Amino acid sequence: MAEKPGLRLQSIFDEGHFIHEKWQRWFQEMGTLYGKWYCLDCDEYFWGGADCHDGPLEYCEVPLFYEPLRIYGHADGWLVNLGDPLMLEIKSIGIGTIRYEANELIGIHNGDMEKIWADIKAPFMKHIQQVQIYMKLAELLGFENAPQEAVIIYENKATQDAKEFVVPKSDFSIAEKFEAAAMIIEAVNNNEAPPCNIRLGGCSKCGGYSE
């Protein structure tokens, strides 16, 4: 059984969940939230907007599983009725996020989170790749009117200030990942080890696959 997180770590998780749920609730009240819903009364799932079913609905976000490549994603939301459809990703930003995604900002601003926050002018690369993968999965799954743009919302954990960034769909930063997934699936189907990605002809770590 997995060990339960400590109080501090659990508090961090809960705060992140609260921020996500808050933004999703706001978009639901605006009539712009689309995706998968669960009806608490009839115990059934529905796809659509918040008006897709009469009854108390719980938002299940946007699960995206492309079986041929075994790639699964789970977007925070899909926005409609605001112009073109938008894939939604919500991120709570604290000093831990900065340390992981843009550690250089801590040194530049001597750990001053207010100054660091002001210096965030664009979404972090990993978050861009994340929404690009979600948009690609929606395309591969054949969703009608699949989003061609994503909106990434950052909320400062300390002050609740928010920033939003719109990211146009592009396969440039993720094409290699999808190609690698296809290569691995082919190798598994052929009962072969995939080619070594460290050295042509294999490296020391490849030995176990040939025994």
What are these regions (language model features)?
Residues 1-87, 93-112:
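Metal-dependent nuclease catalytic cores that hydrolyze phosphodiester bonds in DNA/RNA
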Residues 42, 100-102, 109-110, 118-128, ...:
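Metal-dependent nuclease catalytic regions and adjoining charged, substrate-binding loops involved
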Residues 85, 90-92, 154-160:
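A short mid-domain helix/strand-loop element embedded in enzyme catalytic domains
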